Amino acid sequence: MLVHLNHNPQAPERVVVVGARGFIGSALVSRLRQDGVSALPLSSADVDLTQPGSEEALAGRLRPTDSLVMLSCRTPDKGRDLATTLQNLAMGHHFALAAAKAACRHIVYFSSDAVYGDDTQWVSDDTKAEPNSPYGAMHLTREVLLKSTMAGVLAVIRPTLVYGLADTHHSYGPNRFRRMSEKDGRISLFGHGEERRDHIFIDDLIELTLRVLRRRSIGMALGVTGRSPSFAEIAALVAKQFSPPAAILNLPRANPAAPVLHRHFDITGVLTAFPDMRYTPIEDGVALIHRQAREAAHA
């Protein structure tokens, strides 16, 4: 649940985006500039948070009046081993030290719905975080580090799977399906695509983030839509964007004996905080990305 420190929306004096070269970070910086909000984008080329002493380098760039957004993370597609987890924890530790030293006005930390165990099928603001993956445990540890010193100014956003044209992760879902269709004319599904997962369009996640920044909200928000289509449904939506439609192939599941995982979200918390928040239906988001890709190809 979120609590607003600003009674009315107010543009931040400056937003420092740590992890600004990534999919979400670059979209956030673009939207901030579009809205006329001062933004300082920082990447690992500016401050490498895996390195000892990086907290001093980051703190030296910050002002007490800043709103600070933390996105830096090595996602599972970059590695699932212990070394990657430890690097992520080091980044979180150094960021927390810098944030505490700079005493910024507002902090927004991007976590993940991986903080909930894979077998957690229904998630609301009240659901206990019980990760069963190193990635989820890492994000929860980072949350705890920040809450221990900055709880009074901290907002945590826990997004689900994010999709958009500029995504670089090639994650299973709309992004990968579109690229498969474009390259090979077919989409490969695990099993029959029964698994149901929420997917949020990048523009909607950025809109939620801007609202959190303007209201200087604290607490936790789920970065989700409240709809969980099956991967088969998503594949069909992507396939029909092409002419002829992409073929859909069903591959054997890696572990047929394992249960099919589903996850559904209750978005009451976000709608209570922002009653007019609206989300792009997956069918509209998939069609929009296809148009954007076509326009980019012919630009």
Q: In which residue ranges do the predicted regions lie?
A:
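Active-site Tyr-X1-5-Lys
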Residues: 118, 130-155
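NAD(P)-dependent short-chain dehydrogenase/reductase
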Residues: 144-197, 202, 238
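NAD(P)H-binding glycine-rich loop region in Rossmannoid oxidoreductase-like domains
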Residues: 52-89
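N-terminal Rossmann NAD(P)H-binding glycine-rich loop of SDR-like oxidoreductase domains
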Residues: 3-34
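C-terminal substrate-binding subdomain of Rossmann-fold SDR/epimerase-dehydratase oxidoreductases
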Residues: 185, 190-192, 197-299
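Adenosine-cofactor binding site in Rossmann-like domains, unifying the SAM/SAH pocket
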Residues: 39-57
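Conserved Rossmann-fold NAD(P)-dependent oxidoreductase catalytic core, especially the SDR/UDP-sugar
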Residues: 94-134
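Short-chain dehydrogenase/reductase
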Residues: 85-86, 127, 131-140, 167, ...
